[in-house]
Amino acid sequence: IPNKIHNNILIDILKENKIPTISPLGLQKNQTFNIIGDTAAGAIAKSLQSRRLLLMTNLEGVLDKKKKLIEEVSSSEVLEMIKNNIISGGMIPKINTCLDAISNGVRGVVIVDGRKPHSILFELFSDKGAGTLIRK
């Protein structure tokens, strides 16, 4: 997990009502690292004290043991799902990013299906939302 985000440039860009494009690279002792996009997004959300973080995946969101979408889940429930192998594989690093963000001030993280057209707009501008909301 990145330990420092230099967010001054991001804040300046956002103040100009522009959307920044971020290449998730990290530096340590003159060495460059490629950081997983979800991990970088979580670290940026924490550093900007964001209310919400949206992460995209190739699933509807977090699925229960019957493979049905869970619309809202708490951090403790997610940890239990990992323990019981309901959440596994590549979803675990994404969930860990969610949990880290939530435990560091982000109010909620939503995992949405990036394959569905307009899923982010649906999440932002509808009462029902899209995907899974993970909350503290």
Positions of PLM-derived features:
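C-terminal catalytic "cap/lid" subdomain
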Residues: 1-136
